[in-house]
Amino acid sequence: MIDRSTISYYDAHAEEYAEKTKYVYMFDVRSVFLKYLDPAGRILDAGCGGGRDMRIFMENGFTVDGFDASPEMCRVASAWTGEPVQCCDFESYVPRFTYTGIWACASLLHCTEAGFFAFFRRYKEFLGSSGVIYFSMKTGIEDGYDGEGRWYLGFNDRRLQRILTENPDLRRVKYWKTADNLHRDLTWANVILQKEF
């Protein structure tokens, strides 16, 4: 569940946030994710924000579904991609398709700890055989609210190990760290998990 104050922040700053992140360099990270996908596959952009990655995946020939918990972000993303974007949170999303890949870029970090681990138990069921989940999280931060009222959940090796322990049908295929592309003093963890059976 994404809390109300976090959603309210993105509703109030949707245009500004989307513009700030629209052209952030993500080519390398997206390329790693895409190499695990069937080119005819379907992607779920879970917490799609302003639709930056959703649009690029579409331009690369993929069919993409997107959702976000912020109604204003959904409006911006739909305008940017030309596609409908469903307004819902991680808990209430109901898939109509099976996915080759699930992309959760900088979105799960707004979950509670319980919601974060519940995501993997639930969303792996939306994957087809050998489907993958990509997610990115901030490392080296404490769980809590920032000065803008947004909730953040930090990430560490212990949390990754718990995901794998609770989900033996998910295999870690890649785990790497990257610098912040907005030039903040942050390090991001990037993880790709693959459904084994």
Residue ranges and their predicted role:
Residues 1-38, 40-49:
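Conserved class I S-adenosyl-L-methionine
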Residues 94-102:
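A short acidic, Gly/Pro-enriched loop at the edge of an enzyme's catalytic core
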Residues 170-181:
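Conserved S-adenosyl-L-methionine
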Residues 143-159, 182-184:
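Acceptor-substrate binding/catalytic loop of class I
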Residues 130-137:
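Conserved beta-strand signature within the Rossmann-like core of class I S-adenosyl-L-methionine
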Residues 50-92:
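Class I SAM-dependent methyltransferase SAM/SAH-binding core
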Residues 117-129:
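A short glycine-rich, Lys/Arg-flanked "PGG" loop and its adjoining helix->strand segment in the class I
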